């Protein structure tokens, strides 16, 4: 597979710049992986059991894959995606794999193709392209090695040279898998992150019951504003005891508010009573982002804001299959106006880190880079989700560096559920950054020694610093 094994993958076609990119990449390609934000399952590392069949490992959990197939008429149930009503779905891994292989051509030119080919070649030693004619052969190869000890989760963690990985758990999670990891004596560093969406977003399903549960597990009165905030503080401390260095917030917008305590208390009371006023529900989410930022100022958790996704765009798919089924769509997102209440409150705090992400690329140069380029509390997260492709990463660097520089960004995070693809995702990011730095050197805008230093920072150091790992 020349596209994957070629040493010049994603490097500039011009000879001088390509040579520079090669040298930069050679200096960083084997650096440890810092994965400060993602969605791998801590159960894997806790139990360290063999992964299931190839389809359950590589296809069924990956919405990058099944959303593309669904767009071309393949039913989710035919890909093994479980329905909420318990209706029958395909359970035979080989059948699912064959269906995927028959449609693999759909991924030509996409980052998913790059990542998946990398996994086939570098993890499983497969050199033949995947298609209908090779599907069974590849399935058998992968199914066989998945039973080997050196393909269990902890062994792969070590083989991937992962220095630290963060999972993401909801505020109500008991973190039993993280406790099991800690008690096992295994030295792999797996930390959690605090994701309170289910107890800060009134539109989240079961919100009122979630707040009741939050009160039960903390002993706080979540019927009162003060007790509700205390419950968050207690849960954040609990998550920190299992290594958390960050919280994560997936709000529909970046809107924030900074109400007086009396106004916030009254708003909370109305929300707790089940207010259906959309303006009040939006205002509550906005206020809670600011409250979370103030808590981060006090307890040191890095605050990540992932706004601008219209979640569950298809109500029929959501009702049948639930969340995270490929129907989250980017929207236009305002930051300058939306974040001002939060920034007025804590934006000048030098010991606070708020990492901003976007699905709206038009905001890079107009809003995000100028904001992060002046407010001490702000940093820019890397190209995210729909934009963590080679083209998206290039656009990110080109549109933010001139105003925010490199050191107001946080390196790379893979933000994935697909554990086997983590080395591929980091490799693509490292190659893209080396190509970008090589261009700056070739244009005499950067010295070569500076480019080597920056390559290491972007691949490893900036993520460790920003996420306090």
UniProtKB/Swiss-Prot annotation:
UniProt GO BP: D-galacturonate catabolic process; D-glucuronate catabolic process
Catalytic activity: D-glucuronate = D-fructuronate; aldehydo-D-galacturonate = keto-D-tagaturonate
Pathway involvement of the protein, from the record: Carbohydrate metabolism; pentose and glucuronate interconversion
Gene3D superfamilies the record matches: Metal-dependent hydrolases (3.20.20.140), uronate isomerase, domain 2, chain A (1.10.2020.10)
Enzyme Commission identifier(s): 5.3.1.12
SUPFAM superfamilies on file: Metallo-dependent hydrolases (SSF51556)
EC class (word): isomerase
One MF annotation (Gene Ontology) recorded for this entry: glucuronate isomerase activity
Keyword annotations of the record: Isomerase
InterPro entries according to UniProt: Metal_Hydrolase, Uronate_isomerase
Family, similarity comment: Belongs to the metallo-dependent hydrolases superfamily. Uronate isomerase family.
Protein's UniProt name: Uronate isomerase
Organism: Mesorhizobium japonicum (strain LMG 29417 / CECT 9101 / MAFF 303099)
Gene giving rise to this polypeptide: uxaC
């Amino acid at each position: 597979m020349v596209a994957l094994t070629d040493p010049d993958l994603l490097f500039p076609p011009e000879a001088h710049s390509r040579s520079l990119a090669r040298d930069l990449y050679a200096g960083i390609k084997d650096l440890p992986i810092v994965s400060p934000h993602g969605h791998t399952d801590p159960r894997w590392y806790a139990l360290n059991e063999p992964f299931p069949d190839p389809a359950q490992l590589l296809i069924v959990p990956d919405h990058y894959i099944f959303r593309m197939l669904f767009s071309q008429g393949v039913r989710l149930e035919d890909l093994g995606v479980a329905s909420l009503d318990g209706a029958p779905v395909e359970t035979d891994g080989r059948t699912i794999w064959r269906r995927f292989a028959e449609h693999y051509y759909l991924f030509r030119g996409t980052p998913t193709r790059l990542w998946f080919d990398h996994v086939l070649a570098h993890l499983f030693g497969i050199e033949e392209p995947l298609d209908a004619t090779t599907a069974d052969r590849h399935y058998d190869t992968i199914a066989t090695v998945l039973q080997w000890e050196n393909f269990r989760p902890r062994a792969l963690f070590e083989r991937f040279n992962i220095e630290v990985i963060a999972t993401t758990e909801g505020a109500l999670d008991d973190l039993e898998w993280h406790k099991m990891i800690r008690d096992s004596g295994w030295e792999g560093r797996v930390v959690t992150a605090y994701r309170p969406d289910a107890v800060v977003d009134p539109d989240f399903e079961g919100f009122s019951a979630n707040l009741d549960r939050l009160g039960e597990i903390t002993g706080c009165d979540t019927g009162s504003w003060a007790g509700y905030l205390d419950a968050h503080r207690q849960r954040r401390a609990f998550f920190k005891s299992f290594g958390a260095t960050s919280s994560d917030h997936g709000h529909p917008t970046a809107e924030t508010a900074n109400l007086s305590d009396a106004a916030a208390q009254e708003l909370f009371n109305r929300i707790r009573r089940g207010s259906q006023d959309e303006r009040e529900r939006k205002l509550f989410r906005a206020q809670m982002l600011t409250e979370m930022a103030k808590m981060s100022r006090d307890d040191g958790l890095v605050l990540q804001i992932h706004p601008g996704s219209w979640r569950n765009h298809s109500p029929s798919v959501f009702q049948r299959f639930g969340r995270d089924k490929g129907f989250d769509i980017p929207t236009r997102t305002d930051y300058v106006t939306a974040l001002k209440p939060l920034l007025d409150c804590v934006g000048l705090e030098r010991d606070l880190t708020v990492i901003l992400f976007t699905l709206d690329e038009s905001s890079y140069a107009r809003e995000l880079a100028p904001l992060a380029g002046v407010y001490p509390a702000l940093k820019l997260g890397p190209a995210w989700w729909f934009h963590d492709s080679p083209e998206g990463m290039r656009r990110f660097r080109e549109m933010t560096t001139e105003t925010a520089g490199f050191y107001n960004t946080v390196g790379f995070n893979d933000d994935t559920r697909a554990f086997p693809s983590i080395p591929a995702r980091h490799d693509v990011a490292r190659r893209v950054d080396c190509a970008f730095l090589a261009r700056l050197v070739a244009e005499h805008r950067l010295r070569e020694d500076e480019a080597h230093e920056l390559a290491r920072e972007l691949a490893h150091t900036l993520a460790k610093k920003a996420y306090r790992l």
